[in-house]
Amino acid sequence: MDTEEVDLLVIGGGVAGLTAALVAAIEGLSVMVCEKTGQLGGTAASSAGTVWVPGSSQSQRAGLADPLEGARRYLAAEIDTDSGADLREAFLATGPRVLDYLERHSDVVFAPAARHP
């Protein structure tokens, strides 16, 4: 059996896994993505490929209001656990920075939409 050594092994080719792989490659790491299905994209491949990141500069430039307090209330209602509070805040704080990083360092371009297709 042949072996290959990589800096980052990503299990699953959904949006999160592919984003991790892209960032690692941008930062100079060797990456391998393993996906069990014949299609990359995970659930985004069947959901119009949309992501929701409240407070992004892309939405702000398009004049789309997406106040963080409303997003915070929505997430708290959907992920109603004390242990999830830190994760929700991390998402709200870093999500917009991730989109900016990807646009700045790759060919990825995010197109804001007022509503899901």
What are these regions (language model features)?
Residues 2-6:
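Core beta-strand elements of the Rossmann-like FAD/NAD(P) dinucleotide-binding domain
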Residues 36-117:
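Conserved N-terminal/central alpha/beta ligand/cofactor-binding core
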Residues 1, 28-30, 49, 102:
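Polar low-complexity intrinsically disordered regions
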Residues 8-33:
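N-terminal Rossmann-like FAD-binding beta1-loop-alpha1 element of flavoenzymes
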